[in-house]
């Protein structure tokens, strides 16, 4: 048991880490291009932050959080998402006092106790952006463009942008009355979870994945038809900005998202994975979140996308993730004195900015060359007794097997060759 990771977790091995470096690098490059700066928040937060921010009627808070009491008796939760912690940091450090908007991005592990499946784990990793302090639909469109740009930078095809408006507290309260009236005669046909949602948060019933519930919702009244004037105007503005940026979108009135803080804009990006359509990004506006978390009234909009899901999408579409270059040099030594001299040379090369390694297991020359191939070294440097007597080493180009001799006392020529000059 001790040799197996907990269910729902996954080790990222050295042979796979380059995929993560690539994906994270693209995330960061695109986010910075849009003027977003990185923020890092703790892995755990006070439980109340998520109860107040995410919503105590959500599946995340009711069923999926990793919550425990610390030694001081305080309720602590491993963060299940990144937006509420970003809002907490925005409040704590009084970032609202700066010139707005505040635009931030993060890459973070998040934790949810749910059934593990392809691309989804109990510990997974999320890239997210948050823009606080601007209520204009242009910021919504910018955030959506950022998300689409990430997947376009990956080369992912068949992207579908779906948008909706989930209204504001004012028009949602009126809509909830209409929705409850519609559902009241069908309540017995809904799953237990949706029956519990009926009074507390009926709009989440629309998002239920149960076939029996969906069968009762074929003609359900939609939030889109009950928006107040302000929310309707905001949605119309969003569409204009998306069209101005050349983004094609589909209006999907059934997108409600799984977190209670969303207001007005909600969106998802869909792509095809293993022959099935799957959501690879989701987000929206949350104009009440900062206030609900104890800060001043501040609008916000953002999204989250899973790194594991992104890698899976690339692999499913046959997109090759660039592999990193190998070592500049591997030093092959024969004998104790040669090992010392090789270590001295390797240290000098590393300090000069070159990547390299040497044998540490007293292996045969053949085994050392085999290892040099494994680490994809561009060159090998061979040092044995004969070479030491002459004060030289042999430099071998691993691509064409050409060998030349170099002076050990003066490695200027060696550095020029390794630099490609």
Swiss-Prot record:
EC number(s) per entry: 6.1.1.21
**Database matches in InterPro entries:** aa-tRNA-synth_II (IPR006195), aa-tRNA-synth_II/BPL/LPL (IPR045864), Anticodon-bd (IPR004154), Anticodon-bd_dom_sf (IPR036621), His-tRNA-ligase (IPR015807), HisRS-like_core (IPR041715), HisRS/HisZ (IPR004516), HisRS_anticodon (IPR033656)
A single GO cellular-component term from the record reads: cytoplasm
Give the main location: cytoplasm
Single GO term (MF):
catalytic activity, acting on a protein
From the UniProt record, give one GO term of the biological process aspect: histidyl-tRNA aminoacylation
Subcellular location(s) per record: Cytoplasm
Please list the reactions this protein catalyses.
Answer: tRNA(His) + L-histidine + ATP = L-histidyl-tRNA(His) + AMP + diphosphate + H(+)
Q: Which UniProt keywords apply?
A: Aminoacyl-tRNA synthetase, ATP-binding, Cytoplasm, Ligase, Nucleotide-binding, Protein biosynthesis
The UniProt record lists the keyword Amino-acid biosynthesis? no
Keyword set includes Secreted: no
Listed as disulfide-bonded, the cysteine pairs are none
Q: Which SUPFAM superfamilies match?
A: Class II aaRS ABD-related (SSF52954), Class II aaRS and biotin synthetases (SSF55681)
Regions crossing the membrane: none
The UniProt subunit note reads as follows: Homodimer.
Q: Which HAMAP family match?
A: His_tRNA_synth (MF_00127)
| Protein family per UniProt | Belongs to the class-II aminoacyl-tRNA synthetase family.
Q: Return the protein name.
A: Histidine--tRNA ligase
């Amino acid at each position: 048991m001790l040799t197996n990771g907990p269910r729902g977790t996954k080790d990222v091995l050295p042979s796979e880490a380059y995929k993560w470096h690539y994906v994270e690098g693209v995330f960061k490059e695109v986010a910075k291009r849009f003027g977003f700066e990185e923020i890092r928040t703790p892995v755990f937060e006070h439980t109340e932050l998520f109860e107040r921010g995410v919503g105590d009627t959500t599946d995340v808070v009711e069923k999926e959080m990793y919550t425990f009491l610390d030694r001081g008796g305080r309720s602590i939760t491993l963060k299940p998402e990144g937006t509420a912690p970003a809002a907490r940091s925005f409040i704590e450090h009084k970032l609202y006092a700066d010139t707005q908007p505040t635009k931030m991005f993060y890459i973070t592990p998040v934790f949810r106790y749910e059934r593990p499946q392809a691309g989804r784990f109990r510990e997974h990793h999320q890239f997210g952006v948050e823009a606080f302090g601007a209520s204009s639909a242009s910021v919504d469109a910018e955030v959506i463009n950022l998300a689409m740009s990430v997947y376009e930078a990956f080369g992912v095809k068949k992207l579908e942008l779906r948008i909706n408006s989930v209204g504001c507290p004012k028009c949602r309260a009126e809509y909830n009355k209409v929705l409850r009236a519609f559902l009241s005669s069908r309540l017995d046909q809904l799953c237990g979870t949706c029956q519990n949602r009926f009074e507390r948060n009926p709009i989440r019933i629309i998002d239920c994945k149960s076939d029996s519930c969906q069968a009762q919702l074929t003609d359900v009244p939609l939030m889109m038809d009950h928006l107040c004037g302000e929310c309707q105007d905001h949605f119309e503005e969003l569409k204009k900005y998306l069209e101005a940026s050349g983004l094609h979108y589909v209006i999907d009135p059934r997108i409600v998202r799984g977190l209670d803080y969303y207001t007005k804009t909600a969106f998802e990006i869909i792509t095809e994975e293993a022959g099935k359509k799957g959501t690879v990004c989701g987000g929206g506006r949350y104009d009440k979140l900062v206030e609900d978390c104890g800060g001043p009234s501040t609008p916000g909009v953002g999204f989250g996308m899973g790194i594991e899901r992104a890698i899976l999408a690339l692999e499913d579409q046959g997109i090759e993730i660039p592999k990193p270059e190998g070592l500049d040099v591997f030093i092959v030594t024969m004998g104790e004195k040669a090992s010392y001299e090789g270590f001295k040379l390797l240290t000098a090369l590393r300090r000069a900015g070159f990547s390299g390694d040497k044998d540490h297991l007293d292996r045969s020359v053949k085994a050392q060359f085999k290892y040099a191939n494994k680490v994809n070294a561009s060159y090998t440097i061979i040092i044995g007794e004969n070479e030491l007597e002459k004060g030289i080493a042999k430099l071998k180009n691993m691509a064409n097997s050409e060998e030349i001799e170099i002076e050990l006392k003066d490695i200027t020529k060696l550095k020029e060759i390794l630099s490609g000059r």
